[in-house]
Amino acid sequence: MRIGIIAALPGELKPLVRGWTKVPVARGSGIAMWQRERDGDELVAVCAGMGAAAARRAFTAAEFAGSLDTVLTVGWAGALTGDVRPGECYAASEIIDAQTGERFALPVSRRLRLVTTVQVADEREKRRLADSYGAALVDMEAAAVARLAQIRGIPVHCFKAVSDSVGARLPDLNPFLDIDGKLKMAAFLAHVAVRPQFWGALGQLGRNSAGGAKTLAATIEEFLVEGLRK
């Protein structure tokens, strides 16, 4: 079985792929890929940036050596309610594309909706999304991965670790994302360097993200061992 694990950023996958084989990719592609064989299964983890276009590139890269039998869309997500806690990992039962209205049902017993948007959601937008969709989490990639899985007729599973709470007051990241879904780090750091009101929240975001990536890795490992063949 070939299992694709699609994320946006290397940091989301770092604890999971420790010890995996790094797969060479075209220079300048913006894609990072790792591979591992386990119990007769081939696992391939890929990230290519934030947003739907980057998720599609990552999915295509995962298929380069052969078609996938199942796919996982994983990574960090923002909280839309206080019911999901930063640093914890959750399995979505439904993915909603806020742009198209499409809904993708997933095989999870606990009801938990995730909504995918085209931009990073700020505090105000988070509350609107929670009210409009009854969702608990927001990301930028899951719907694109779910759509590609549906087209191919393969199962999709969604695991997201919460990086920021519903009330987190973070700087607007959207102006600092390039066309490939990568953060323009130098420009972003220059922006926040003179805005100390964001320093505490960004520090908390970093801690939540690091802890969440570890929890995400443990959740994925457990799923691959116990949940995949149920």
Model-derived regions: residue spans:
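Glycine-rich phosphate- or other oxyanion-binding loops that anchor nucleotides, phosphorylated ligands
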Residues: R2, R27-K230
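N-terminal beta1-alpha1 ligand-phosphate binding loop
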Residues: R2-T21
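Alpha-helix boundary/capping residues
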Residues: W20-V23, A62
